Every structure is written in structure tokens, then in C-alpha cells.
Amino acid sequence: ADPAIRNDQEARQLEILREYLDEKGYVEQRLAAQLDIRDMPPGTYAAHQNVPVIDANTGQRTNMPIDLVVAPHTKLAIDMPILIEAKSAGDETNTNKRRKEEAQKLAQLRATYGEDEQLVLFLTGYFGLNYLKYEAAEGIDWVWCHRVEDLDSAGI
């Protein structure tokens, strides 16, 4: 898929998420690089946030880009913000090549922040049943772009 098209689609997805969060009283912030995301003020969100994780291979701290980090108005039991990745695909071939990326991201997040860490995919386009089954087996939830209100069940 053309990266320019994918970037445009991600921008549209993030705009849908911003509108949804703004309507629920959330405030967008740009977080300082040194701020631990667990210390985000409740009711805030940040787009294109680098989240520090420990690299499983090197043991070194590295930054993982996350499309949207949301600190719910009421803290969740895991005391972590909700991490959302915007994903779009035009065909099944593209999704099958990339499906392990999200699982690897979640594994690094869980190695750093604990087994209860969650990653939510915000999907638009073609995602076949095999892709969705794979992500579910890895413990990754998803919400379709046209059903943004389903994020309510994630604690937003």
C-alpha cells in the first residue's frame, strides 16, 4: 500500500478519535518526553506519543511510538492509560504481512509495564478473519473506525 495513502488514512482515524474524546470531555496534551505515561492527568490524551519500553533483545530502554495514549477520567485497575494504534489496510495480503507487529509491540509493553497492559487497534479497511483471530489470540482488542463508541468498553 502507498505510504501516503496510509498516512492520510491514519490522520482521518486520529481525527475521528479526537472528536470522540473531545465530546467526552478529554483534553489533548503534548507530553514531555520524560513524563511517565502512568502519570498523565486523568481525562487527557496525547497523539503520536513515544512510550518507553525495555527492548527484549538488548535490555536497553527504547521509545515505542504509539498513535494515541488516553488517560481515562477514572483510572483503570491496571493504572495504565489506554494505548491505541490506528491501522488501515486495503487488502488481506498487507494485513497478513504486518499482523505480528502489533503482537510484538504488546509483548514489549507487557514486559515493561506488566501482563495486564492492553493495546487496542483502531481499524479501517480490509482486515480478514485470520488477522482478527491472530490478534485476539495474542490478547489484542480492536475497534472498528465506524464504531468508535465501542471504545467505551475499554474504559474511556
Task: Describe every region a protein language model picked out.
Residues A1-Y26:
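Interdomain/boundary linker segments immediately adjacent to catalytic/signaling cores
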Residues G25-L35:
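Short, well-structured beta-strand/strand-turn elements
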Residues L35-I156:
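Catalytic core segments in nucleotide and nucleic-acid processing enzymes
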